[in-house]
Amino acid sequence: GAVFFVLLPRTAHAALRHLIPDRFHISGFSNEVLLGQIGQLRLSSTPVMHTRIYNSAAGVDLKWRGTTLAQFDGRRWFNEIDRGEPVLVNRHQARLAALEQLGRPGRRVHYEVQLKSATDDVLFFLGVPEVINIDAPQIIRTAASGYRTGGLAFSSRYEAISFVDDPLSPPLTPPMMSEAARRVHLQTPLMNPGVARLAREVTAGKLTSEAKARAIESHLRTQYGYTTELLREPVRDPVGHFLLVRRQGHCEYFASSMAIMLRTLGIPSRVATGFQSGSYN
């Protein structure tokens, strides 16, 4: 079956953690997400990248995905160490998608990315990346459906063509998950049983995985509030506390809760980290 991606518009930082007092946490990009922090979240206005769209992107929800996280221990989303597989770049170009995807009818966006600040060596893409133009001998495809430079020096600028969501385009048949991958994407830590009960209540009467996912998304959007105020004291079960007690939080709580609620229903899921939208000029 398919695995659902739940996007985090921005994630807790790692590289800047030592630059500020412990009671403050700066938003940014990281290869892990930590829940249950106390203090206050400060949104960073430091530009992370400049982008240029070469064709019309009207109506496109600009979500720049960096990587995905599948392991969750109750407080932290992370991935096991993954060396990935090389994708050779021939004459500055590499194909990232299978032929079936390349032949799929639907909308494409052609864009340029200029990375501006440290984001490890992660490459960011819209939608489903199909082709990249980059001044590097190779890039690395990770098991988490992401791409990185592998530590190689490159110009920090690249162009790409991506397939973007199009309701008129026929869906692809999702590849079958291995039993090992399915176990990872269904794993849930010990938590308040009310989380699974809430997931069943919210999705009652919904027959498909997609319908259940949309029901959970709608519930979180309409019944919970957004705040940058973090917890005043630590809790043992951050997801359960968010869903059943506090009912407000920042992006990490919404995405984590949706992914875990899906998993309690037997629907494989993981969170995708990156950035959403931006300033236009």
Q: Which residue ranges define each predicted feature?
A:
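Helix-boundary/low-complexity linker signature
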Residues: 1-281
